[in-house]
Amino acid sequence: MTYRGTRKSPCCSPPPRCGPPLPSGPAGSALGPPSSGAEEEMTKEQVYLREFQPADQEFARRIFYEGIKERILSSAFRGLKYQPLLQSVYAVIIIMCFVVTKSLLVTCCMPLFLLGMRYYYSRKIILNHLECALRTDMSDIEQYYMKQPGSCFWVAVLEGKVVGIVAARGNEEDNVVELRRMSVDSNYRGKGIAKALGRKVLEFAMLNHYSSIVLGTTAVKIAAHKLYESLGFKHVGVVEHHIVPGMTHSLLERLFFQLRYHRYCLQLREE
């Protein structure tokens, strides 16, 4: 069977295919294909993974948008836990507030003000970042992923509804593929959908003979990092004060918004 998703030819030329079906497994296998020769794979929750189709565009954009938007709160509040320097700065500000105002009421309100400013800047920057993504690769998934050599985009479908997305973007020079845009509808999490999507990218990388898979994330939630580790990824570094589109680098922005960018890698074979 000819595989249409190699790195030397567009992976999704009509009819769209980014890879062959998984090898046949025992009947009723949780991750095995539903029938011989079928494209989709099925999880135990009856979730099918298939290639992106043009009709999925708005559903995929919605899932991506809502998934990133969730990071507003986590970046503003939970992220402070991993920013000891800012914690110290805020403590000094609160102390100075009391020294200057001599007001216990004003001083007690200062932490709420600081958290409010963190939320404001987190929302402002993340929404700007989202708009940038929606104007670039997520504006035309078909063109950016399905028609590019070594790239592909998949959706997870449950009962006819798109509930999850993931993309793979190949880099032939480094012989690596990047796992991108993974997100699952918040109403359908905890069903193993994200792990199945991640495995789809692993399968794609192996079939295309890439040496490794890389990904980067600013996610604060521990569950996201545990997911990558469960797929075999190794944490290879973190970039403090990560810059995203939409940032102005102002003093107030640096004071109330910081991102940590985690890099992961899964080595498939030695070069």
Curated annotation (Swiss-Prot):
A molecular function GO annotation: L-aspartate N-acetyltransferase activity
InterPro entries: Acyl_CoA_acyltransferase, GNAT_dom, NAT_camello-type
Domain N-acetyltransferase stretches: 115-258
Catalyzed chemical reaction(s): L-aspartate + acetyl-CoA = N-acetyl-L-aspartate + CoA + H(+)
Membrane-crossing segments per the record: 89-109
Positions with biased composition (Pro residues): 12-24
Record's keyword terms, sorted: Acyltransferase, Cytoplasm, Endoplasmic reticulum, Membrane, Microsome, Mitochondrion, Transferase, Transmembrane, Transmembrane helix
Subcellular location: Cytoplasm; Microsome membrane; Mitochondrion membrane; Endoplasmic reticulum membrane
UniProt-listed Enzyme Commission number(s): 2.3.1.17
Ranges where the record places region Disordered: 1-38
Gene3D superfamilies assigned: 3.40.630.30
Topology with respect to the bilayer: Single-pass membrane protein
A single Gene Ontology CC term: mitochondrion
Compositional bias (Low complexity): 25-37
Similarity comment: family membership: Belongs to the NAT8 family.
Function: Catalyzes the synthesis of N-acetylaspartate acid (NAA) from L-aspartate and acetyl-CoA.
Name recorded for this polypeptide: N-acetylaspartate synthetase
